[in-house]
Every structure is written in structure tokens, then in C-alpha cells.
Amino acid sequence: MNILKPQNNHIEKLKNENIINIQETEKITCCNFENEECNNINLYENEFEHCNFNNICMQNALVEKITFRDTIFKQCNFSNTEFRECSFIRCEFNNCKVSGCDFTENRLYNVSFIETNANYINLSMASIENILFKDTSLEESYFQETKIKNIYFNNANLRQAQFFKTSLKNIDLSNSQIEGIAISLEDIKGAIIDQIQAIDLLYLIGVKIKQ
């Protein structure tokens, strides 16, 4: 596993700012955003670099054409926010809520989700590379035609997650929960699972287990 972490996010070097004061197309560098509630906000064509977001509540927002680079999100709530044409490069979500977020057609590169609630997340047609989901819940998440490379699930909850035209070849699912996962035989081919998980996938070959 070789996922690059956010670079140079030393809190003593960051200046405190408020999200509510951000202007369209503004570039924000080396800033700390903390203890702010800004639900239903719209952000457009901004670039965040070397920033920290701590205890930010930004639910039901529209975040469009934004680039987050070398940025850390800690204890933030972005539930039901739509990220439209956004890029996340060397970012980390730690103990956050991104449940119901729409990341359709976004680009995620070297991003870690740690102890994060990502239930109902939509990563359809996104490009995700070098991604870690650790101790993270992705229940009923949606991956349709998602371009994936070097994805790691470490104790992830993938119950009832849906994968469509998204290959999991060579991806290790063995220590994650996959009960009720919706996937085709073609997409699951080559994935790494344990013996017990194999039972959850027998429906793909049309057999039933006699009790």
C-alpha cells in the first residue's frame, strides 16, 4: 500500500479563515477552517491547498469545480453534499460523515477515508486511484462504471453496496463485510475473499444452500 499523505499541514503555520467568506474562483492556501456550520452553501471554482477542515458542518451543499490538494478533513459532516466535477489529491477524511454524498465523475487520487461514515455514497463514473477505506462504512454505496486502481478496503462495511461495470479484480475484500453486495460475476472475478464470504456470492451462480 503506497498512498501518499497530505503534505505540509502543520497547524501552527495555518491561518484561521471562515468558509462563509470564501469568494468564487478564490484560491485558498495554508488555511485552517474550524467549528463552522455552513449548510446549503454553494462553492464554485475554488482551489484549497494545504488546508485543514476541523469540525465543519456543511450538509446539503453544492461544491462545484473545486480542487482539494493536500487537505485534511477531521470530524466534519458533509452529509448529502453534491461534489460536482471536483478533484481530491492527497487528502484524508478522518472520523467524518460523507453519507449520501454525490462524487459522480469526480477524481480522487491518494485519498484515505478513516473511521468515516460513507453510507449511500455515489462514486459512479468517478476516477479513483490509490484509495484507502479503513474502518469505514460504505453500506448501500454505489459504484457504476467507476474507474478504480489500487483500492484498499480494510475492515470496511460494504453491505448492500452496488457495483456495476466496475471490476474488483485483485482487490482484497477478505476482512470487510459484503453481505448483500450487488455485483455481477464478471465484476467480482479475481477479487480476494475468504471462505465465509463465498457463501454470500453463491447467488451469482444460481445455487441455493440447503439448511
State each model region's role:
Residues N2-Q211:
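Tandem repeat scaffolds
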